[in-house]
Curated annotation (Swiss-Prot):
Biased composition (Low complexity): 123-148
One protein family per Pfam: MSA_2
Region of interest called 7 X 8 AA tandem repeats of G-S-G-A-G-A-V-A, as start-end residue ranges on this chain: 51-110
Provenance organism: Plasmodium falciparum (isolate imr143)
Protein name: Merozoite surface protein 2
Lineage: Eukaryota, Sar, Alveolata, Apicomplexa, Aconoidasida
One GO BP annotation of this record: cell adhesion
Length: 300
């Protein structure tokens, strides 16, 4: 009998300890499940406003995309296009014209010795450029070399002792000098006019391009200013949505729990109540089993 009593007492303690362990495990699992379920429900309730905010954010993105499309397109069309059309085109036209003009002036300079009158007539029609200083120097060098060649030829053909024949050479020198002076004056009078016209025209075109560029910037500025406002409103709505969702749920649950309606306290409280009920049931089973063991040990 003593052995049975001791065994029953040992069994009772083992059973109690086992139930306590199981109770702690179940209570911990139920508390964790309740906490996880409350978090999930709060996340599910907060998903619709976050989706709406995501939609408004997409609207802000489309607005920014529209700004990028129209603004950058306007810049590419009006700004860069104007620069390519007027700036680069003017440079290409004036640059190519400069090379052609300088070549034409070099050709007329080379032919000045043969036909000064015809070359003087050609000189206004030739396009003058920024390289007019080199062309005038070429013209003067060509005229001087041609005059020196003629004088040298005349000096060789005419004998030295005949003073009468040398007088026409002096007259020829004077006429050639006069023609050279006139030609230089004509080239100098023609060069600044065309140079001023050509130098003014390319500067006017970049000014027009610069004037067109600020207009593109002005058209670009209001759109770019409107895009951050859309983004700001999207973020503003998102912040208010995230703030307003959770406190309302907590306040409602607190009000319902303070009123005494335990059924409406929410998922977290109901699950916690269930876990506490299960723990109390386990305690009741332990007590019943203990009494039964003691009764059998005592009466047997």
């Amino acid at each position: 009998m003593k052995v049975i009593k001791t065994l029953s007492i040992i069994n009772f303690f083992i059973f109690v300890t086992f139930n306590i362990k199981n109770e702690s495990k179940y209570s911990n699992t139920f508390i964790n499940n309740a906490y996880n379920m409350s978090i999930r429900r709060s996340m599910e309730e907060s998903k619709p406003p976050t989706g709406a905010v995501a939609g408004s954010g997409a609207g802000a993105g489309s607005g920014a995309g529209a700004v990028a499309g129209s603004g950058a397109g306007a810049v590419a069309g009006s700004g860069a296009g104007a620069v390519a059309g007027s700036g680069a085109g003017a440079v290409a036209g004036s640059g190519a014209g400069a090379v052609a003009g300088s070549g034409a002036v070099a050709g007329s300079g080379a032919g000045n010795g043969a036909n000064p009158g015809a070359d003087a007539e050609r000189s206004p029609s030739t396009p003058a450029t920024t390289t007019t200083t080199t062309t005038t120097n070429d013209a003067e060098a060509s005229t001087s070399t041609s005059s020196e060649n003629r004088n040298h030829n005349n000096a060789e053909t005419n004998p030295k002792g005949k003073g009468e024949v040398q007088k026409p050479n002096q007259a020829n020198k004077e006429t050639q000098n006069n023609s050279n002076v006139q030609q230089d004056s004509q080239t100098k009078s023609n060069v600044p006019r065309t140079q001023d016209a050509d130098t003014k025209s390319p500067t006017a075109q970049p000014e027009q391009a610069e004037n067109s560029a600020p207009t593109a910037e002005q058209t670009e500025s209001p759109e770019l200013q409107s895009a951050p406002e859309n983004k700001g409103t999207g973020q503003h709505g998102h912040m208010h949505g995230s703030r307003n969702n959770h406190p309302q749920n907590t306040s409602d649950s607190q009000k319902e729990c303070t009123d005494g309606n335990k059924e409406n306290c929410g998922a977290a409280t109901s699950l916690l109540n269930n876990s506490s009920n299960i723990a109390s049931i386990n305690k009741f089973v332990v007590l019943i089993s203990a009494t039964l063991v003691l009764s059998f040990a005592i009466f047997i």
